[in-house]
Amino acid sequence: MDIREIQAALPHRYPMLLVDRVLEVSDDHIVAIKNVTINEPFFNGHFPHYPVMPGVLIMEALAQTAGVLELSKEENKGKLVFYAGMDKVKFKKQVVPGDQLVMTATFIKRRGTIAVVEARAEVDGKLAASGTLTFACGQ
């Protein structure tokens, strides 16, 4: 999926759209990327002399990745996905300008409109962040 297809699925726009491309998507798994550049607005304050992507934004990027997975299903087109929670979140590596964040999300449980995914973000094959994300699909 290119950026136009991602924008058709997600309501997010600059500066909050944190998925640049989807490399693969199946019924229960997705791989996407975020190219992190020094031009990201959050680097102005986090931190000016030592820019590091905020962990909460890495988790948001993972949530958006999972959202694309859910909203790529025909029955969910035009709906919204709402973050409902995160658990077992771990940050293992700093993400800095020039990094390419490779994000994966895999469904592990679904009940009605609630879904749970295992999500991972890696840079150069090394784990940067992971967690279990819960979200709801609604109108």
Curated annotation (Swiss-Prot):
Reactions performed catalytically: a (3R)-hydroxyacyl-[ACP] = a (2E)-enoyl-[ACP] + H2O
Residue numbers annotated as active site: H46
Top enzyme class: lyase
A GO molecular-function annotation: (3R)-hydroxyacyl-[acyl-carrier-protein] dehydratase activity
BP GO annotations: fatty acid biosynthetic process; lipid A biosynthetic process
Location of the protein in the cell: Cytoplasm
Gene3D superfamilies reported for this sequence: Hotdog Thioesterase (3.10.129.10)
GO CC terms, sorted: cytoplasm; membrane
Pfam families reported in the protein's UniProt record: FabA
Entry keywords, A to Z: Cytoplasm, Lipid A biosynthesis, Lipid biosynthesis, Lipid metabolism, Lyase
SUPFAM superfamilies: Thioesterase/thiol ester dehydrase-isomerase (SSF54637)
EC number(s) reported in the record: 4.2.1.59
Presence of keyword Transmembrane helix: no
Chief location bin: cytoplasm
Similarity comment text for this entry: Belongs to the thioester dehydratase family. FabZ subfamily.
Function field: Involved in unsaturated fatty acids biosynthesis. Catalyzes the dehydration of short chain beta-hydroxyacyl-ACPs and long chain saturated and unsaturated beta-hydroxyacyl-ACPs.
HAMAP family linked to this entry: FabZ (MF_00406)
Descriptive protein name: 3-hydroxyacyl-[acyl-carrier-protein] dehydratase FabZ
Organism field: Streptococcus pyogenes serotype M1
